[in-house]
């Protein structure tokens, strides 16, 4: 409770000089904190021990997070606002309060909030400033494994994480942060809202990502810092952005940013994309604060890394250990599902992709990301994705889907790859397409590509 009390005291001390901007309104930190206490008492009045919410971004959602730490409840679960009732049914427990701004037929106890701003401003100020600091926060996995897993963290873990990130992310005291990704997303929560509150930054929040709106805010306001998923940067680059913008900091996480995207961002915005890396289970655990190679990330000093190397290889499965390991995971080392190598001197992790995407050809492990990085060095190839095709002899063969303004032969591409990669990693086939498919979360849809190549 001491950590939380200090955190809340800091928010109060930032007082009326720092703001959260939303649509045409602004709220100072004192208002945000006061509403958080009022909201905590409001939640307690319902009598439920568990609270779920899939609200879109607003100052109300920021206060709801803080209120969950203050209130006498046991569990707070923020949920992706894009999920539909069928998916929500697998997440939301019956004996709980579900706070939503969408019409839902879910058979649970619902608090429907039609207008977050009106609700926020209508809450009466409480004089009860008791802080209980007992609820666990559970961020939810994306469901790609077939079920939704809740990862539990104590308030002390979260507050310590926020304080530890103050100097790690490259944010500065006078930054103005634009939050365009759902705050219920672990990336936006851990890399944006938490450190911004800990530092005392001005924050502009938009309800949900809209490339035109983001561009307009960048052009009109004093926003200096932005963090998005790779696909969001693609959409943002299609907009008109003034060359005299005030941006100085661009972070990217959620998926590996391609060389072509990094180059395009640098050309248009004049800034490097700074890679971050993390998981829903442990939040972010690494972030570059200066330009680096595309697939390298500086790991936070409070995170230990272990690599279980593949045979005859300098890279392998990535395991991590830090203070953010979820309470409901009984393991000392967390397997990330990623593959890479780690430099203990520079404390940098080289990331080569997901383990499930590794191609095993004739017993040799081949990283798609490693090949994609090399392929994108060939002129006129704008984007690519490398995948495996089932083969009776080799087990798997190596194929690439290419988006290119000039079509090359397989032989030509393999000749180019010899400058970068060993012979056994050469491509067995290429297919030209108009665009690389993406998932609903904006990531490269490797599953669909694998199904396409294998006619599944």
Predicted region positions:
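AMP-binding/adenylate-forming core of the ANL superfamily
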Residues: 306, 311-329, 333, 339-341, ...
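AMP-binding/adenylate-forming catalytic domain of the ANL superfamily
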Residues: 421-444
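Gly/Ser/Thr-rich phosphate-binding loop
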Residues: 225-227, 237-294
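Conserved AMP-binding/adenylate-forming core of the ANL superfamily
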Residues: 8, 13-45, 58, 86, ...
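Conserved AMP-binding/adenylation subdomain of ANL enzymes
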Residues: 159-176, 184-225
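Conserved AMP-binding/adenylate-forming
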Residues: 25, 39-82, 180-182, 365
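AMP-binding/adenylate-forming catalytic core of the ANL superfamily
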Residues: 41, 339-425
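Conserved AMP-binding A3 loop
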Residues: 28-29, 133-163
């Amino acid at each position: 409770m001491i950590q939380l009390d200090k955190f809340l005291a800091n928010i109060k001390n930032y007082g009326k000089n720092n703001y959260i901007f939303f649509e045409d309104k602004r709220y100072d930190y004192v208002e945000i904190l006061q509403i958080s206490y009022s909201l905590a008492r409001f939640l307690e009045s319902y009598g439920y021990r568990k609270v779920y919410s899939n609200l879109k971004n607003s100052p109300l959602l920021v206060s709801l997070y803080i209120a969950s730490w203050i209130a006498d409840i046991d569990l707070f679960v923020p949920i992706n606002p894009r999920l539909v009732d069928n998916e929500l049914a697998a997440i939301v427990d019956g004996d709980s309060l579900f706070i939503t701004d969408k019409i839902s037929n879910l058979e649970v106890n619902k608090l429907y909030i039609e207008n977050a701003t009106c609700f926020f401003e209508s809450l009466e100020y409480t004089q009860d400033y008791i802080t209980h600091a007992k609820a666990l926060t559970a961020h939810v996995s994306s469901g790609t494994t077939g079920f939704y897993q809740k990862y539990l963290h104590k308030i002390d873990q979260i507050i310590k994480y926020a304080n530890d990130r103050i100097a790690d992310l490259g944010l500065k005291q006078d930054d103005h942060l634009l939050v365009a990704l759902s705050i219920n997303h672990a990336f936006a929560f851990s890399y944006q809202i938490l450190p911004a509150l800990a530092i005392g930054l001005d924050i502009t929040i938009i309800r949900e990502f809209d490339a035109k709106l983001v561009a307009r805010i960048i052009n009109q306001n004093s926003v200096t810092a932005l963090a998005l998923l790779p696909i969001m940067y693609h959409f943002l680059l299609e907009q008109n952005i003034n060359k005299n913008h005030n941006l100085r900091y661009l972070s990217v996480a959620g998926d590996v940013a391609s060389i072509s995207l990094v180059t395009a961002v640098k050309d248009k915005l004049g800034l490097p994309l700074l890679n971050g890396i993390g998981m829903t289970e442990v939040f972010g655990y690494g972030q570059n604060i200066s330009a680096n190679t595309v697939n390298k990330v500086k790991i936070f000093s409070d995170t230990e890394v272990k690599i279980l190397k593949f045979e005859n290889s300098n890279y392998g499965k990535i395991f991590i250990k830090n203070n953010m390991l979820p309470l409901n995971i009984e393991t000392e080392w967390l397997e990330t599902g990623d593959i890479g190598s780690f430099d203990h001197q520079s404390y940098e992790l080289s990331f080569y992709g997901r383990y499930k995407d590794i191609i095993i050809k004739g017993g040799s492990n081949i990283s798609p990301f490693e090949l994609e990085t090399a392929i994108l060095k060939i002129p006129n190839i704008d984007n690519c994705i490398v995948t495996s095709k089932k083969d009776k002899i080799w087990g798997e063969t190596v194929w690439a889907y290419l988006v290119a303004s000039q079509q090359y032969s397989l032989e030509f591409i393999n000749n180019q790859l010899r400058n970068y990669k060993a012979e056994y990693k050469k491509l067995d086939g290429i297919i030209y397409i108009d665009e690389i498919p993406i998932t609903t979360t904006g990531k490269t849809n490797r599953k669909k590509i694998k199904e396409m190549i294998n006619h599944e």
